[in-house]
């Protein structure tokens, strides 16, 4: 299983390495499989709920399920937002590859908005259908059954589609959808981060080797391979930890915290960058100032709240607990993962600042700096 996971990342890295067109076409296939199968699953489940053939314990769909004021406490709300930020991560890939789109001034923004809408509708439909079909009971196929938590779609898929040959065929397609989703997630982790390190290298924030472009595929070679290699290293580290599955779950929470941090920072940066335009029109004030800044504040507040919850074992919604050496404090696993990641990031920051001081002295990137495009390697 470990070897399969490593080979999986290698294959996804190679696809990203081969070019943006190959990656985009592969992503279309994966996304198409996901959306079609989730739609078929959801509609079939809702039809069975409607005609009374769903398993005992099914529920009638209710619009009240979307009411945030029905959430039991604010901590659960904050944790849910951070989790959704993690789920959304990767759907903004078009923004990271904007220079490689046909219309870099409009297409990435439209794609980001469209992808957000598609993700929202898809998740709402699947959640409504699965909660209606399975109910929240703690036995059988109920969503409250902890034994179903690791493979909800597979368990519900067998019941939704039935045991007929065609139903079995759809169930296997659903499992293929899960596999394609894993592939798409891996690809949308490597692809945008490679472009981020490419941009950082072009402006000399990190070593210039990360700015190398393949002469034929026109992809960032070192950046792509490095991101794939880091993914493998993290995967191996998680696998060989004392509580592998639990640590992976905590890593998801910790990554969500960092995504909330840098999404929030992006909102602040947007408001600051366009600060001179804010008084020119009401639209600019809202779209370039108030909304990005408010979004940044909300994400930082919820992220900070979640960090505090993850620090205290009594309130942490984590998968593991860790005891701090010498002082014997018990803290949540997500907090530990977040702190370790922060220490690694701080060390990398000082290393790059010492090796590449020009960027940190604002000599390579200012407001007036033109967009730099690296030449492909010959």
Regions found by a protein language model. Give the residues of each.
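Transmembrane helix-loop junctions in multi-pass membrane proteins
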Residues: 15-21, 206, 230-251, 274-277, ...
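Inter-helical loop and helix-membrane interface segments of multi-pass membrane transporters/permeases
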Residues: 1-7, 13, 52-77, 243-247, ...
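Membrane-interface loop-to-helix entry segments
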Residues: 2-57, 112-116, 258-263, 284-298
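Hydrophobic membrane-spanning alpha-helices of multi-pass integral membrane proteins
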Residues: 223-235, 262-265, 289-310, 337-342
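Helix-loop-helix junctions that connect adjacent transmembrane segments
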Residues: 29-172
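Terminal cytosolic tails of multi-pass membrane transporters
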Residues: 267-291, 309-378
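Membrane-helix boundary/coupling elements in multi-pass transport proteins
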Residues: 88-101, 165-208, 252, 261, ...
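TM-loop-TM module centered on a large, flexible mid-protein loop between adjacent transmembrane helices
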Residues: 111-187, 206-255
